[in-house]
Amino acid sequence: MSSSPNIGFISLGCPKNLVDSERILTELRSDGYNIISSYEGADLVIVNTCGFIDSAVQESLESIGEALENNGKVIVTGCLGAKENQIREIHPQVLEITGPHSYEAVMKHVHKYVPKPEYSPYTSLVPKHGIKLTPKHYAYLKISEGCDHRCTFCIIPSMRGDLDSRSIVHILDEAKRLVDAGVKEILVVSQDTSAYALDKKKENASKTVFWNGMPIKNDLITLCEKLGSLGAWVRLHYVYPYPHVDNLIPLMAEGKILPYLDIPLQHASPKILKMMKRPGSIERTLERIKKWREICPDLTLRSTFIVGFPGETEEDFQLLLDFLQEAQLDRVGCFKFSPVEGAVATDMEDQIPEEIKEERFHRFMQLQQKISAERLRQKIGRTLPVIIDEIDEEGIIGRTMADAPEIDGVVYVDNFSKVEVKLGQIINVTITNADEYDLWGEI
């Protein structure tokens, strides 16, 4: 039995929150704590919460309650932690509460209730790239915190603050450690990836810096070029449609980063986009998509949209459907508008009844499923590189360059017994079949 204190840990929410959890776990292990996956035997439990939408808030509150019931000693951090009063009202017995990315405060509270061990065997087991909660062959890389936009449906800036970009040197150093440790795919995340380093320009701090003895600029294009030189797949998420995003497409065409753009557009009605405080020129967006595909024919476009936003008429919704038909996006997520405490849109007039939201959601998804199915069918007969995520007796499950883990489709490979393969390996697969979301193929 180890003499090191045991810390239980619950991580909720998005990949950005997962990165925060990984950092806290790394610091816990570096300080000699043992991380366990159960309440029983834990000297303390940390719950890293999500507070983006009401369902996430409810899940976080329930997880806190479960930890209290089964253990009793609980520290809360994460996005919902920015609303301490809301947590205390339901769970007053929580020991301490901090907001998101409050790593030092979390560790200070842990030390207060469970003193740091004088010696622990776990301190020597921390890998150079830190503790990761993802499979060994891919990892999330957070490049900034916060967001300068004030979209009316979102409360992230009130929780995570304004844009705060990391140093390009620190990001590249972390990325190199990941690749050196065997990571084959780096998933770049933030609240607003395309805004990377724009805050430093405002502060006149975007000067040339040195990495590996060479001068480099502290900007998004340079970051992507350098990440692409490390030898791993590089996938960009949460890209706001700034004009300079156009400059990323040639890098994708050249194979420096994956030809994959996760660009949340949210709607297509100029009226609704204006109410959301989002960019409103859909004609311009369609022109850009056409140009992007001319430069990089293999480009995969993923986006997310909201239906049932306050004031959305049938005409507004039809504009959204028309846009989907014309844009022919590859991967699309759809959310029914959900009131969030603190969001401007929650108090707007003309809230849409739930039954209309539901009906529009289904119409949206029916159309997009047809589009996605047709775009996937176009891949039948092609031989594509596939990264292996799972291997079992039934076959291989992997992903193409067009598929991010968790949110996109997969490739099922049946005849894997003909060759020896391992997790994280990138193999060539000939596509034989497709449906609305997934592909099937053979080696």
Curated annotation (Swiss-Prot):
Binding sites annotated in the UniProt record for [4Fe-4S] cluster 2: 147, 151, 154
Question: What's a single GO CC term here?
Answer: cytosol
Query: Which PROSITE patterns does UniProt cross-reference here?
Result: MTTASE_N, MTTASE_RADICAL, RADICAL_SAM, TRAM
Q: Which domain of life is it from?
A: Bacteria
So what does this thing catalyse? L-aspartate(89)-[ribosomal protein uS12]-hydrogen + (sulfur carrier)-SH + AH2 + 2 S-adenosyl-L-methionine = 3-methylsulfanyl-L-aspartate(89)-[ribosomal protein uS12]-hydrogen + (sulfur carrier)-H + 5'-deoxyadenosine + L-methionine + A + S-adenosyl-L-homocysteine + 2 H(+)
What's a GO biological-process term for it? tRNA modification
How is the co-factor bound, per the entry?
Binds 2 [4Fe-4S] clusters. One cluster is coordinated with 3 cysteines and an exchangeable S-adenosyl-L-methionine.
**Molecular-function GO term, any one:** metal ion binding
The record's InterPro entries line, in alphabetical order, gives: Elp3/MiaA/NifB-like_rSAM, Methylthiotransferase, Methylthiotransferase_CS, Methylthiotransferase_N, Methylthiotransferase_N_sf, NA-bd_OB-fold, Ribosomal_uS12_MeSTrfase_RimO, rSAM
Q: Which residues bind [4Fe-4S] cluster 1?
A: 14, 50, 79
Q: Where is the MTTase N-terminal domain?
A: 5-115
The record's similarity note reads: Belongs to the methylthiotransferase family. RimO subfamily.
Function of the protein: Catalyzes the methylthiolation of an aspartic acid residue of ribosomal protein uS12.
Q: Which HAMAP family match?
A: MTTase_RimO (MF_01865)
User: Can you name this protein?
Assistant: Ribosomal protein uS12 methylthiotransferase RimO
Biological source species: Histophilus somni (strain 129Pt)
Q: Give me the gene this protein comes from.
A: rimO
